[in-house]
Swiss-Prot record:
Organism listed in the record: Streptococcus pyogenes serotype M18 (strain MGAS8232)
Protein name, as recorded: Peptidase T
Cofactor: Zn(2+)
Location relative to the cell: Cytoplasm
NCBIfam families, alphabetized: peptidase-T (TIGR01882), PRK05469.1 (NF003976), PRK13381.1 (NF009920)
Active site residues according to the UniProt entry: 84, 177
Lineage, broadest ranks: Bacteria, Bacillati, Bacillota, Bacilli, Lactobacillales
Length: 407
């Protein structure tokens, strides 16, 4: 009974295209996210017994409350998941359900793609389980619709079993996490909890309270275009300036060469002509000092190139995006200790590792609500090879229920 609607709920959610748009200036960045909140999630939240369900058109958050049914459970706990999906095709998501996976390749629909354990050895962790995959033409959207489905399923179970005592619970579904702005307008006053959890992690047992600190870097290169036949000592090729700039960054400090606590510079876009070029980067690191040092390094490279060119032709624009939430959460580890205790009681081994990324919890933690991250089940996220285990999603439901009953 506890999990009866989990799979159907998840399938229903992922079939709705809620891809966010980094170029949009609206909140949410796409109309489909608001429609998803208002036409699908809000009625369902009300139907399963959440109270004071309301949508804030200013920040795109849909919030509901389940009051405590035991006055001695005085903590207030929140659960957060994001509605948008990543920058990959999300039109006509057509999930495949693989019952009792027995190993080997999984053909993704009628496409030429397959999930191969040689390329994706994480498949070997799911022998005997029910896997939900893509058909090879889209992402799946388990990031983070598995989190939404898990929260909904846990609430539905609690309201159907009033004899199960629980604390005050707040639920929030928000927009635009994948483009890094989802929590920018989050209203703490509308989410009065002692701490919260984003249900936005990956495999079973993930419990995370360290994220990258993150910055966006835009570098504009100003060239001088003349006819290539008479270009000697006159032409300044903006594209070549971009190449020179990139080559001055440490070659081994890129995502493809780093892991664990190592930071990186990541070139995400390069456009331009001889006259003008633009390079987009993201900068990531865990430690505050090394994060700041990376930003200083790119400024110094630009200054050095401009000095050599004799004029300002390399223009740097740096914007911090979010910070490592460890700085906030380690001041009071209650949320982590509670989650560890609940997982261990459920015979789930907590896997406490840094997130090589960020969550909405990064920003929300700095707003005053410690918000670590818990597994939601997704694997190979953000692309056609994404999949999720139904059994892992069920365990996430168990963790949510355990947290609110133990609070």
């Amino acid at each position: 009974m506890k999990y009866d609607n989990l799979l159907d709920r998840f399938i229903k959610y992922v079939k709705v295209n809620t891809r966010s748009d980094p170029d949009s200036e609206t909140t949410p960045s796409t109309e489909s996210q608001e429609a998803f909140a208002l036409t699908i999630l809000k009625p369902e939240m009300e139907a399963i017994g959440l109270q004071d369900v309301h949508y804030n058109p200013v920040n795109g958050y849909l919030i509901g409350t389940l009051p405590a049914n035991n006055p001695t459970l005085t903590r207030k706990i929140g659960f957060i998941a994001h509605m948008d999906t990543a920058d990959f095709n999300a039109d006509n998501v057509n999930p495949q359900i693989i019952d009792n996976y027995q190993g080997g390749d999984i053909t993704l629909g009628s496409s030429n793609y397959k999930l191969d354990p040689k390329a994706f050895p994480n498949l070997n962790n799911y022998i005997g389980q029910t896997l939900i995959t893509t058909d090879g033409t889209t992402l799946l959207g388990a990031d983070d619709k598995s989190g939404i489905a898990e929260i909904m399923t846990a609430i539905e179970f609690l309201t159907s079993q009033p004899q199960i005592e629980h604390c005050d619970i707040k639920v929030a579904f928000g927009p635009d996490e994948e483009i890094g702005v989802g929590a920018d307008k989050f209203e703490v006053a509308d989410f009065e909890v002692d701490f919260a959890y984003t249900m936005d992690g990956g495999p079973l047992g993930e419990l995370q309270y360290e994220t990258f600190s993150a910055a966006a870097l835009e570098v504009t290169f100003l060239g001088r275009n003349v006819h290539p036949g008479t270009a000697k000592d006159q032409m300044i090729n903006a594209l070549q300036l971009a190449i020179d700039f990139h080559e001055k960054l440490p070659a081994k400090e890129r995502p493809e060469y780093t892991d664990g606590y190592q930071g990186f510079y990541h070139l995400t876009g390069l456009t331009g002509t001889v006259e003008e070029a633009r390079a987009s980067y993201i900068i990531r690191d865990f430690e505050e000092a090394s994060f700041e040092a990376r930003k200083v390094k790119v400024e110094n490279i630009a200054q050095s190139m401009n000095a050599q060119l004799g004029t300002k032709r390399v223009l740097v624009e740096l914007n911090d995006q979010y910070y490592n939430m460890k700085k906030v959460i380690e001041k009071d580890m209650t949320a982590i200790e509670l989650a560890k205790e609940v997982m261990e009681e459920l015979t789930i081994k907590p896997v406490i590792e840094p997130i090589r990324g960020g969550t909405d919890g990064s920003k929300i933690s700095f707003m005053g609500i410690p918000t670590p991250n818990i597994f939601a089940g997704g694997e190979n996220m953000h692309g056609r090879f994404e999949f999720v285990s139904l059994q892992t999603m069920e365990r996430a439901v168990d963790v949510i229920i355990g947290l609110v009953c133990k609070a």
